[in-house]
């Protein structure tokens, strides 16, 4: 089902599905029991633009920590549960806004019913998570290996288990580290369910490889009109996940706001440290709430012309640089003042 037509689900004070904006999610990578570290990381993620946060709940101490964590953050809190149904119940009792479980490994029908009963009482959505790495043996044998068909069949089977308990406040996530398999599976699943989908490429890798895999996979899936929440899974600081997710959504026209920085690839004419300058500009504009394009160009020869599509830009020279607006040179400034001049222009943009 395309995102405009998926079932509307409330997660804390946020709403997904039914054509609502695609929300950005991440997951903490510090022990949930360490409340101070967990809250500090979540607040950093919030500042970067994270809209839903997931924490692992492997034990009772972690479940109890959720209550204190929730008091100090400002976005919905999702509990990630593996195997132990008691942790799912404890997480909900301690304020989780959503739980993520695999109904197939929670301990049987009776225990699943106990989890669903609490979710129903508190109106807490359940995210059904299926990963290609843990696909059931019978489905691997049925389809001759790990396949998109097997992943989708597994997910729908798990959804039915919850529906049979009389509950339909459900979000589905299916993940694979194989990008094309993940794309195929999401296209298949979207045609078979009305539930909103959380989209991500699992085990995607480091910042470099993970960004490439996620950009391709999420880009295709989202462009097809599929997906209600996303996560760019990276091995590293989760704040990097948020930066990447925002850029993916902006590139696809699914998110407005925030300055887009473009820069030239450099050539032999470049007379300034363009790589360093571009990185400085990107960091500098991160907290400026403008919906414009900024160009950072390496020379005065092609810089103005190539920056025509940008709202404003700078181009380097020998000891000096140019301030450009819509391809027109506005003024020359010393190289040492380029960054400050650009920032001043941006801060006074609407004046």
Set out the residue ranges of the language-model regions.
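Active-site mouth loops of central-metabolism enzymes
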Residues: 19-37, 56, 75-83, 139-152, ...
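Glycine-enriched alpha-helix->loop->beta-strand junction motifs that scaffold or abut catalytic
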Residues: 72-75, 92-99, 120-123, 190-196, ...
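Glycine-rich, proline-tolerant flexible connector loops at the mouths of alpha/beta enzymes
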Residues: 29, 34-35, 46-69, 100-108, ...
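N-terminal amphipathic alpha-helix/helix-capping segment at the start of soluble metabolic enzymes
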Residues: 1-26, 120, 283
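Hydrophobic faces of well-ordered beta-strands that scaffold small-molecule active sites
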Residues: 22-28, 53-55, 77-81, 99-101, ...
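Hydrophobic or amphipathic alpha-helical targeting/insertion segments
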Residues: 86-127
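Catalytic alpha/beta core domains of metabolic enzymes, predominantly
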Residues: 131, 139-286
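Alpha-helix-loop-beta-strand connector modules within alpha/beta enzyme cores
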Residues: 60-81, 114-126, 186-197, 281-283
């Amino acid at each position: 089902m395309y995102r405009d037509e998926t079932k509307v689900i409330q997660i804390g004070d946020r709403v997904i599905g039914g054509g609502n904006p695609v929300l950005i999610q991440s997951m903490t990578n510090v022990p949930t029991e360490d409340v101070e570290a967990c809250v500090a990381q979540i607040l950093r993620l919030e500042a970067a633009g994270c809209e839903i946060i997931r924490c692992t709940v492997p034990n009772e101490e972690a479940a109890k920590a959720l209550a204190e964590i929730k008091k100090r953050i400002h976005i919905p809190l999702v509990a990630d549960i593996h195997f132990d149904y008691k942790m799912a119940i404890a997480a909900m009792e301690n304020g989780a806004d959503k739980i993520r479980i695999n109904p197939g490994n929670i301990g049987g029908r009776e225990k699943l019913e106990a989890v669903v009963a609490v979710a129903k009482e508190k109106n807490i959505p359940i995210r059904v998570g299926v990963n290609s790495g843990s696909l059931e043996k019978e489905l691997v044998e049925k389809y001759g290996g790990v396949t998109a068909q097997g992943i989708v069949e597994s997910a729908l089977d798990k959804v039915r288990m919850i529906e049979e308990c009389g509950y339909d406040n459900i979000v589905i996530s299916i993940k694979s580290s194989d990008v094309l398999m993940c794309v195929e599976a999401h296209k298949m699943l979207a045609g078979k369910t009305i539930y909103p989908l959380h989209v991500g490429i699992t085990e995607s890798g480091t910042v470099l490889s993970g960004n490439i895999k996620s950009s391709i996979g999420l880009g295709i899936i989202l462009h097809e009109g599929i997906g209600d929440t996303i996560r760019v899974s990276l091995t590293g600081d989760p704040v990097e996940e948020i930066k990447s997710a925002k850029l993916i959504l902006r590139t696809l026209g699914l998110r407005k706001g925030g300055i887009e920085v473009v820069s030239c690839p450099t050539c032999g004419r470049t007379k300034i440290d363009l790589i360093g300058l571009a990185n400085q500009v990107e960091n500098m504009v991160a907290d400026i709430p403008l919906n414009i394009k900024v160009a950072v160009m390496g020379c005065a020869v092609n810089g103005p012309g190539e920056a025509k599509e940008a709202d404003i830009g700078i181009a380097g020279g020998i000891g000096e640089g140019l301030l450009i607006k819509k391809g027109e040179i506005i003024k020359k400034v010393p190289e040492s003042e380029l960054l400050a001049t650009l920032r001043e222009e941006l801060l006074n943009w609407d004046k």
